[in-house]
Structure formats: C-alpha cells, structure tokens
Amino acid sequence: MRMIENNTYTSPFSDMLNSSASPLQDQFGRTFNYLRLALNEQCNLRCMYCMPEEGINFRHKDKLLSAEEIFRLLKLSSQMGVSKIRLTGGEPLLRKDLVPIIQYANCLDGVNSVHLTTNGLLLSKYLNSLEQSGLSGLNISLDTMNADKYKIITRRDGLKQVLDGLEKAIDSS
C-alpha cells in the first residue's frame, strides 16, 4: 500500500525499512531467524478451505509491496538476523518478479536458505528459472493424489500438471 505525501508515493513501511537494524527478539530474549513473506494473495486455485470459487476482490498489484520494497524488507530482515526465508502467497509463481526476489534474497549476507511454498500448477513452467535463481527448496501444497478429489478440493483440474512438475523437480535435484 502506498500513500501520497508531497506528491510522491511512499510505503507505510518506509520508516521501518530506512531505520538501522537490531536483532528481532521476543519478550523472552529469543532471536528470530526466520521470515515467512507472502508475496501476493492471488491464486490459480480455489481450494474449498481457502477461498470462495468466485466473487473475490483481490488487491490490485499496485497495493502490494513492490519488488523494491521487498528488497528493502529482505535486506533489513537479514541485518536483523534472519537467515531463513520462505516465500509464499497466494501463489507466488504468479508474481512476475519472483526470480529476481529469490536471487536478491540469496545475495544477502547471513541468508543461508530461501524456500518457496507453491501449489505446483506452474512448477514445470518455471522450474529451470527457479533452479537458476538459487532457490534452496520447495514446499508443494498437495491435498490429495486422487484426481477426482483434487478437482473437488481445488475446484480446478490440475493434478497431472502438479505431479508432472513435482516429477521434474525430483529428477533435477
């Protein structure tokens, strides 16, 4: 979300993203080293436990964090001791700037793993790019191996696509 100040757009996170970093700690002094970042809310499935089949008013992409804002957030997080990053959504593979985000996260001092949670529908299409980006690992959300049940749960026909992507990912590892 961006706000207008003096005819310029700013993020509500600007103060935080421009401040100096100290370790993230809870009230007991435990340091957090893990960041889970939802990159979007859009999804190419309509799982019955997650969202309605239709009538969803997603935020416009201009109201989501831009790649530049995500880069600053990732940098600040790494400066605060975050070493593990998990990128989620919605469906993060729908985000066109996903690969540069993964590459940037991998270049940060102290970050030693970047993982992605996906429903796997687009995995075959983007697997080579994900491998080249330096992605550390994948978590594929898959509720069933039965095609009929998959179609009922997700309200989409796509189990074969997911399994093909999963097989390609296993073969390439």
Describe each PLM feature range.
Residues 5-113:
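Conserved alpha-helical substructure of the radical SAM core
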